[in-house]
């Protein structure tokens, strides 16, 4: 939701304790959104560049364009047209339902927004490709990334753990078909790794039945919530993310910052993880390759250490201040002459 923008210093001061509480009690979510967008619209000056996230309405975008302002949209995931096909195919393969909420109306709405905006930030190569596949003009797309904060980086250390120590492998995110967790659990069970797989995140209703066969397995832990996610990364040995559809998941950037060797799908980390440099980038459905990657990291502490050092080093280029500078340069370059 777009934040309510208020000029009055007095109102700003009391907003958290009084103003917003009253609004939330008196108005529905849809009316709060309308009010937020109205107040936001009132603050726009003639030469402002407007940056919108997916939750903003088509009506707001239309009003801003009629004012003559340049609008930049953030596309946090693949184009919905592409996402729906990927998830529909997996839904059919698994014989499950309600994997996603993407409708033709929401696809048409996204197409209309992308047609009307001036530029769109894409956080990953596959998001960029999905936009191109959906006929978004190449010169509208600003290819970038997401990132991490410096405090989320871990100082590199030499691994002195014995080579036969059980590994701690982590998955972090919503546990659903979209993230490919059902595939990961199958691969993990068949790989027979000396270690534990920690699946950290809430399990979506659509995948509950698929999780049941794995709940009694000793070396698989389902953890619904953790209060200190950074500690989880620090204590882990390997990060895994076999996503079928993503934007550019922040959890992958955190894995680099923690110096974790990564095994990810292209959706889970392409553009962030470099294959055979700081991890492996493997098609989510390539079962044999996933098992081989898990075994390779289990059997070689040297490879884990090599990937770990490369991961931590590569995280430097994804620090938010650098990503912000890169995004600013991209946009300024496009705006030259406008």
Q: Where are the regions that the model predicts?
A:
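Donor nucleotide-sugar binding/catalytic pocket of nucleotide-sugar-dependent glycosyltransferases
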Residues: 93, 98-155
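Conserved acidic donor-binding segment of nucleotide-sugar-dependent glycosyltransferases
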Residues: 275-276, 280-287, 296-301
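Aromatic "clamp/platform" in nucleotide-sugar-dependent glycosyltransferases that forms part
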Residues: 244
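Acceptor-binding helix/loop patch of EC 2.4 sugar-transfer enzymes
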Residues: 15-26, 71-108
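Short hydrophobic beta-strand element within catalytic cores of glycosyltransferases
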Residues: 261-264
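Short alpha-helical donor nucleotide-sugar binding micro-motif in glycosyltransferases
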Residues: 114, 225-226, 232-236
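Conserved donor-binding/catalytic core segment of Leloir-type glycosyltransferases
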Residues: 149, 157-179, 185-190
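Nucleotide-activated donor-binding/catalytic signature segment of Leloir-type glycosyltransferases, i.e.
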Residues: 208-226
